[in-house]
């Protein structure tokens, strides 16, 4: 399983629209594997291509909101328990104080 660092750059338009305009990942232990993109869709596509990989964000609470929004607007359903995972679902671990620990997207359930 590969591990990456990841970060989003965002912009706000008219106080009510914020979007990812740039992203970058770097494989931990292989700095030659540096990927960049210009929108959240290309980031999600890259994550899907890197099956079973982990992406570490410096500020998951902020960047993770974009991932969750993307998932909810692209046919994914949030499930609370891993035993309820199906295709196109996601799980989160967020504390009652709003601390984000994990967001896991399941494109297809492992059989």
Predicted regions and their residues:
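Metal-dependent nucleotidyl/phosphoryl-transfer cores and adjacent nucleic-acid-binding surfaces
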Residues: 1-111
């Amino acid at each position: 399983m590969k591990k990456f660092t990841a970060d989003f750059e965002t912009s706000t338009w008219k106080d009510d629209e914020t979007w990812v305009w740039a992203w970058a990942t770097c494989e931990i232990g292989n700095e030659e594997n540096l990927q960049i993109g210009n929108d959240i869709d290309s980031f999600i596509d890259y994550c899907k291509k890197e099956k079973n990989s982990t992406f570490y964000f410096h500020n998951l609470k902020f960047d993770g909101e974009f991932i969750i929004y993307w998932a909810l607007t692209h046919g994914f359903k949030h499930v609370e328990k891993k035993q309820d995972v199906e295709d196109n679902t996601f799980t989160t671990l967020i504390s009652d104080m709003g601390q984000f620990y994990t967001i896991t997207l399941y494109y297809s359930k492992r059989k």
